[in-house]
């Protein structure tokens, strides 16, 4: 591999925000500065890159950020990055600002942008930042742990009042295409039913029958965790109440799941991944994605990472069903 001289590193956050992104940014900045490099922050993701919203970052610029949710660099989408012209323009801007290596924090869509920039000569490293846990090359993504805990605490509160009023509660969590958040919340909150986007053919009649059976067994509530990809929570609540006679309410947690101070796990894992991204660039690696598997931090070719498929672990789903007696 030809030696790649890295003097200046850029960092951006792209797509939806996730708690822990600031910890990753902080780690990139301070690791790079500690190794004698310059760091440039790109505001508002690829949109900011194309608009040349590029600033120098110092160690003080990332002080008091590790505990903050969201992203201090802000984030946005830009359709222009899907075009060859947009990709070439972005690569040219990186060269104009002397950005020898670029760390991209985001999900699959963000990685596709990094992949294209790599094709045009920009050394890129991707860090998995998404609350959906839907990146196949890694068992962990920045923000997932915080989002699960945020949702879990909210669902606990709904469960309290659901039990008091002997209600059925449908709680909708995020996850348009992936049901990991719903699955983990379902297990953590002891839900009676989990509806996943991977299982579109769920049987509402079976849910109604199960609610009736649970009431006969003396259960005072019935909790359904519904992933965003299934949706229709409000109408579902009306139908279930009509069929069972049990008061049913729907709660949509929405964007609160993306906010909040990151957990210790998200802070630590994001910090290690951010530092590793800088080290990989200094080793001459490019077009890579950092991941976490089997207790180790590893890196994958970005093309291989994007080609991987990730499904819901059946054993975990089965356990959730077994425990919902």
Label each PLM-derived region with a short phrase:
Residues 2-3, 49-102, 109-110, 142-149, ...:
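Glycine-rich oxoanion-binding loops at beta->alpha junctions
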Residues 8-15, 71-76, 101-104, 169-172, ...:
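Short glycine-rich or small-residue beta-strand-to-loop segments that form or flank ligand, phosphate
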Residues 18-28, 50, 84-85, 101-115, ...:
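Short glycine/serine/threonine-rich phosphate/pyrophosphate-binding segments
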Residues 244, 288-325:
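Phosphate-binding loop/pocket of nucleotide- and phosphate-handling active sites
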Residues 2-50:
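N-terminal phosphate-binding or glycine-rich loops at protein starts, especially the Walker A/P-loop
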Residues 14-17, 37, 42-47, 77-78, ...:
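Short, ordered loop/turn segments at secondary-structure junctions
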Residues 104-106, 116, 123, 144-247, ...:
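Accessory alpha-helical/coil subdomains and C-terminal extensions
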């Amino acid at each position: 591999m030809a030696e790649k001289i890295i003097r200046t590193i850029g960092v951006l956050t792209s797509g939806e925000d996730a708690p822990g992104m600031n910890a990753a940014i902080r780690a990139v900045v301070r690791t790079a500065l500690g190794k004698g490099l310059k760091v440039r922050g790109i505001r508002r993701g690829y949109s900011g890159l194309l608009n040349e919203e590029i600033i120098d970052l110092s160690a003080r610029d990332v002080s008091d950020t590790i505990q903050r949710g969201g992203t201090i660099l802000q984030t946005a989408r830009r359709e222009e990055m899907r075009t060859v012209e947009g990709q070439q323009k972005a690569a040219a801007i990186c060269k104009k600002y002397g950005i020898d290596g670029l760390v991209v924090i985001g999900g699959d869509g963000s990685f596709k942008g990094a992949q294209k920039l790599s094709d045009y000569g920009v050394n890129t490293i991707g860090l998995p930042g998404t609350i959906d846990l839907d990146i196949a090359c890694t068992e962990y993504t920045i923000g997932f742990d915080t989002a699960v805990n945020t949702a879990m605490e909210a669902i606990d509160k709904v469960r309290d009042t659901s039990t008091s009023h002997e209600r059925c509660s449908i709680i909708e969590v995020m996850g348009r295409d992936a049901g990991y958040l719903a699955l983990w919340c379902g297990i953590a909150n002891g839900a009676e039913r989990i509806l996943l986007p991977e299982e579109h053919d769920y049987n509402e009649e079976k849910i109604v029958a199960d609610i009736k059976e649970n009431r006969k067994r003396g259960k005072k509530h019935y909790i359904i965790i519904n992933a965003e990809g299934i949706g229709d929570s409000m109408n579902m609540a009306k139908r279930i109440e009509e069929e069972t006679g049990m008061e049913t309410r729907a709660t949509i947690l929405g964007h609160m799941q993306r906010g909040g101070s990151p957990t210790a796990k998200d802070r630590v894992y994001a910090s290690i991944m951010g530092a590793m991204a800088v080290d990989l660039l200094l080793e001459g690696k490019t077009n890579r994605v950092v991941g976490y598997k089997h207790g180790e931090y590893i890196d994958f070719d970005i093309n291989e990472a994007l080609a991987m498929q990730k499904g819901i672990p059946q054993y975990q789903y089965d356990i959730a069903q077994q425990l919902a007696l």
